[in-house]
Amino acid sequence: MPQLPSRNPTIGIALIVTAMLVVPFMDAIAKLLSAQYPVLQLVWARFFFHFLVVTPLALWRHSPIGFVTKQPFLQVGRGLFLLAATVCFWAAIKYIPLADAIALLFFDAVIIVALSALVLRERVQTSRWVAAGVGLIGVLMIVRPGFEAFHWASLLALAAAVFFSAFFLSNRVLTGEVVPLVALSYQSVGGFLVMTAIMPFIWVTPTATDLALMLAIGLIGATGHLLLIRAFEHADASLLAPYLYAEIIMQVVLGYWLFNDLPGSWTWLGIALIIIVGIFLSIATKEASRSDNQPIPGAHL
């Protein structure tokens, strides 16, 4: 394991804010392109170009020996959770505003509370269950089932939150198996292979401009992950957790700028509740985490 650089919390905060301001452009590009291309083709681009960027870098820094792991199938399987989350989320944002979808995605911090108790058999404090209930109220404010504002695609965003929860829990199980950059390479393999197998059946030949945008999707995703890795090397998860929610702000800005979407009053209230609960649960997660250098709920890339 290579020695970590000297820690500088200010640099860590700057890196994570940069990541959270950049990554929403990936989702915005996917939403724009989904009008002309299948969502699955865009997901392929996200994993294919991610793989092309990260894997050579990981091999250069850590050599093939660094890829040795006791659980290679679980490493790749972890990436399949990320694949499923990406498919569901990008299918959702094709139909609903970016801000609504990302707010529902941040509900994964609440889902992790339940899965930690049910799957990992962890003891969950009463305060965290209460916070989970408050977060659920926030979700209901955004989704509003039974009301005219309800859209079925909101359920896809919630499904994405479930898959992201499984992804984060698998990260916890695999903590320390390989260095973060190698883990980042592993998580792209499953998505890259699965989506490449599907491409011959759904491929729509992109224009040169759209191909460049697809490349940008993969580059933004890989860059965001690398920025997060560096951020967690410099600062504790508990310090960085609140800054993850800059992603929601940027999604609102891009949604208004590109699609003329602005959240309504109920959605704003729901977003506020989910942010408050998410920050509380992310900080609480640090106490039970085995490593502060692992991504925490909220880093959706």
Segments from the language model and where they lie:
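Loop-to-transmembrane alpha-helix entry segments
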Residues: 105, 121-141, 147, 151-154, ...
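Hydrophobic alpha-helical transmembrane segments of multi-pass membrane transport proteins
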Residues: 21-25, 29, 57, 76-91, ...
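Structural signature of hydrophobic alpha-helical transmembrane segments
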Residues: 37-52, 91-109, 150-163, 207-221, ...
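Specific alpha-helical transmembrane segments that line the substrate/conduction pathway
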Residues: 41, 48, 91-121, 237-255
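Glycine-/small-residue-enriched transmembrane alpha-helix faces in small-molecule transporters
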Residues: 1-41, 149-173, 293-301
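Helix-helix packing/entry segments at the starts of transmembrane helices
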Residues: 102-107, 174-189, 225-257
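C-terminal-most transmembrane helix of multi-pass membrane proteins
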Residues: 2, 249-301
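Membrane-interface interhelical linkers
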Residues: 1-18, 51-77, 126, 176, ...
